Amino acid sequence: MEEFQVYLELNRSRRHDFLYPLIFREYIYALAHEHGLNKSMIFFENQGYGNKFSSLIVKRLILRMDQQNRLISSANDSNQNPVFGHNNNLYSQMIAVGFAVIVEIPFSLRLISYSQGAEVAKSHNLQSIHSIFPFLEDKFSHLNYVLEALIPHPIHLEILVQALRYWVKDASSLHLLRFSLYEYCNLKSFITPKKSISIFNPRLFLFLYNSHTCEYESIFLFLRNQSSHLRSTSSGVFLERIFFYGKIKYLGEVFYNDFQNNLWLFKDPFIHFIRYQGKSILSSKDTSLLINKWKYYFVDLWQYYFYLWSQSGRVRINQLSKYSLDFLGYLSSVRLNPSVVRSQVLENSFLIDNAVKTLDTRIPIISLIGSLSKAKFCNTLGHPISKPTWADSPDSDIIDRFVRISRNLSHYHSGSSKKKSLYRIKYILRFSCVKTLARKHKSTVRAFLKKLGSEFLEEFFTETEEEHVISLIFPRGFFAMRKVYRGRIWYLDIICINALVNHS
């Protein structure tokens, strides 16, 4: 954000709305390239043009765009575009990378003003992402129903452009965005989130996709506040849009004028909402009547206000006592633990059946084995196989790699209620390591283990750093120590360390 302020020197009151001239500045592409090297490589593969990035190509691109008589595209010949010539794909992607930086400038300037002491909108429910873990432990077991709605797609390209026009008031920039989208997608009018990320700049498309989903979520949060009379998380700069304020005002009038008598049907003081992996997840403590009303609300909102076709079958309602929610790499559900209490009054005794709701988090072992199979640690049945691509490394490096993966998975899934599934994962990694070493030394697994013994694999069984700290706090024979090892332990860094969680 400081780099934007130094390079751009924009007047926040006027000039930040006119972003089109920035596409002709070389430092924009330099900033985008530096950002990609530092951050985006964590999540996305190289698209094939990163090694071709140079200042010479940027200058050539700017010169081509600056020639006004060549800014007419031919729809009949998308591969030989007069603007970009034979380097159509390369130049289109470079423009997308630069434009992704440009459209974020208004938000970056607002964040800079906040960091310099400007007043930030207050919220009584502004929480960190790490509040997920207390929510799972303290509140999840009290919920009854969960609603999972697949966010409808394909999304028309024009809808993405229209969603951005209320943030960027520069018409030239919007025309450039529209031109780039249609040009790079080969004039195909529809895209899906997964397809767009694979063929277009990930940073730009994630920005456009999140801005689009934020539109209907803002209206949902408004109605949710009106129905439950609870404050929700402030969205800050993402709610500064005149068009959708008009929609919210209209919906508010309809809500109060037409449905005031039935307001009690929507009241739910215990409702939670989150968007995760292309799904809108709504959980509630109330009855099935209320959750079904929210189901048809989602369908109608997408169809009549955002022109996205959605069917009620894409919205599923499940009871948490009979269904496991796939969230953050865990299968979370509410388990009923039956218990019998004997009560005696004078000479009469009674047996009282009592069921206690508890949180049950399980490891999706089938999906995890599928991820290990894709990574070539085992076959589809879970049988360990060797890793031939690592066979050229030293023995110590091979063992360190396998041990690191095993510890990361154990660290991530330490919040599981039953850790027996982790033993199978460790078994797969341990014997995959042995088979890789045996393949390197051109020996069988049995002969290799007989020759060196199993001591060299004891690192798979040594305690982690966190377990060592816990053992220092509680003695090994202490009762609380045994309870800690059997119970769930949530580590705050698991949000970003495990790449195998995204099984899809």
UniProtKB/Swiss-Prot annotation:
GO molecular function terms attached to this record: RNA binding
A GO-annotated cellular component: chloroplast
Pfam families documented for this protein: Intron_maturas2, MatK_N
Subcellular location: Plastid, Chloroplast
Annotated GO biological process: mRNA processing; RNA splicing; tRNA processing
Keywords, comma-separated and alphabetical: Chloroplast, mRNA processing, Plastid, RNA-binding, tRNA processing
Key word Hydrolase present: no
Function per UniProt: Usually encoded in the trnK tRNA gene intron. Probably assists in splicing its own and other chloroplast group II introns.
Record family assignment: Belongs to the intron maturase 2 family. MatK subfamily.
PANTHER family: MATURASE K
UniProt protein name: Maturase K
